[in-house]
């Protein structure tokens, strides 16, 4: 909690494509069942600081309603063998200030023994409703949400801003990371 207070007490050195808080995305009018789990945010102070965090050149800072998002994602159940997976629609922020709608379904990537040992980690896959070749992979853990969107223009990343802060996320193009920078999972 002290970390969150200190982060929210400082001003953004955030370099976004859009500096104002966003209205609910217009795309949700077409897909109202997706709900709104992400909102642009502005943090005030001299800088955003999180020990060990490497910031991309451009990014979008978002506030995530993580408890609601987690509940929504966990409402989709893994299919029984031979059955088609349940799917849900999820509005996912993009670095350019927009939202994409993705059809999300649970996916198994961990060995059964690991999945049984860590039931709080869930993984999902999906595709863009508008651009079916665009794929998303995402996971939820007690530490927050991470995602990678594979587009024809490169990868888009979604990461918690700081370890232990699940409701503040960065959305950015992987190409905007400094040369040689490693993702949090690569360290």
Please identify what each model-predicted range represents.
Residues 14-187:
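Zymogen propeptides/activation segments of proteases
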């Amino acid at each position: 909690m002290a970390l969150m207070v200190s982060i929210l007490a400082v001003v953004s050195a955030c370099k976004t494509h859009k500096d104002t808080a966003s209205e609910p995305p217009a795309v949700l009018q077409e897909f109202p069942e997706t709900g709104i789990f992400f909102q642009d945010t502005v943090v005030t102070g001299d800088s955003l600081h999180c020990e060990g965090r490497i910031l991309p050149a451009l990014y979008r800072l978002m506030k995530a309603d993580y408890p609601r998002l987690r509940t929504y994602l966990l409402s989709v159940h893994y299919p029984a063998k031979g059955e088609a997976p349940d799917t849900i629609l999820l509005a996912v922020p993009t670095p350019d200030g927009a939202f994409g709608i993705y059809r999300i379904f649970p996916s198994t990537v961990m060995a059964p023994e690991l999945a049984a040992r860590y039931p709080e980690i869930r993984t999902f896959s999906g595709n863009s409703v508008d651009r079916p070749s665009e794929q998303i992979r995402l996971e939820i853990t007690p530490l927050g949400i991470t995602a990678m969107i594979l587009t024809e223009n490169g990868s888009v990343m979604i990461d918690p801003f700081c370890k232990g802060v699940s409701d503040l996320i960065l959305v950015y193009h992987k190409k905007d990371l400094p040369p040689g920078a490693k993702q949090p999972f690569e360290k």
